[in-house]
């Protein structure tokens, strides 16, 4: 990787032992190995993601070329492979399309209001009034409902 030989590693180990001491050296080695593993895994995931994106781009380019040439009289094997490529491309883009679109019918169904029964409130001094139950708030002092 860095073109470091065995003797260079021995020298680095001896210098680390002298500088850090025998108590802190194992912790430093564990920390360094953890960071190296983390960097390697990140690099591998980025590499795999780039390869996947390049493959998808190649698939899209091949599909565009096939559509531009309008190849209708291809062999059955090529027709089948083109259909597989189309379905693969659609399955890749389908989750993104579903996240961005909102279906109005389902959104309206979720916000359906339920009917509210009115509550009548009467106090000794006033005439009875009727207020909707959704706006009524109980009073903690008297146990009655106030608008």
Swiss-Prot record:
Membrane topology according to the record: Single-pass membrane protein
GO MF annotation terms: protein transmembrane transporter activity
Stretch list, region Disordered: 114-147
GO cellular component, one term: TAT protein transport complex
Residue ranges crossing the lipid bilayer per the database entry: 1-21
Keyword Transit peptide: no
BP terms from Gene Ontology: protein transport by the Tat complex
One Pfam assignment: TatA_B_E
Record flagged with keyword Cell inner membrane: yes
Functional note: Part of the twin-arginine translocation (Tat) system that transports large folded proteins containing a characteristic twin-arginine motif in their signal peptide across membranes. Together with TatC, TatB is part of a receptor directly interacting with Tat signal peptides. TatB may form an oligomeric binding site that transiently accommodates folded Tat precursor proteins before their translocation.
Assembly notes: The Tat system comprises two distinct complexes: a TatABC complex, containing multiple copies of TatA, TatB and TatC subunits, and a separate TatA complex, containing only TatA subunits. Substrates initially bind to the TatABC complex, which probably triggers association of the separate TatA complex to form the active translocon.
The protein, known as: Sec-independent protein translocase protein TatB
């Amino acid at each position: 990787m860095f073109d470091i030989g065995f003797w260079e590693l021995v020298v680095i180990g001896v210098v680390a032992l002298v500088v850090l001491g025998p108590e802190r050296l194992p912790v430093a080695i564990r920390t360094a190995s953890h960071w190296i593993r983390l960097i390697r895994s990140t690099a591998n995931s980025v590499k795999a993601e780039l390869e996947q994106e390049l493959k998808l781009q190649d698939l899209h380019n091949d599909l565009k070329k096939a559509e531009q040439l309008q190849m209708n009289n291809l062999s059955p094997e090529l027709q089948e492979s083109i259909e597989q490529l189309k379905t693969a491309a659609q399955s890749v883009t389908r989750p993104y399309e579903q996240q961005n679109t909102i279906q109005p019918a389902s959104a309206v169904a979720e916000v359906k209001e339920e009917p509210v029964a009115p509550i009548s409130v009467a106090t000794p001094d006033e005439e009875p009034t009727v207020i909707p139950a959704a706006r009524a708030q109980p009073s903690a002092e008297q146990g009655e409902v106030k608008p």
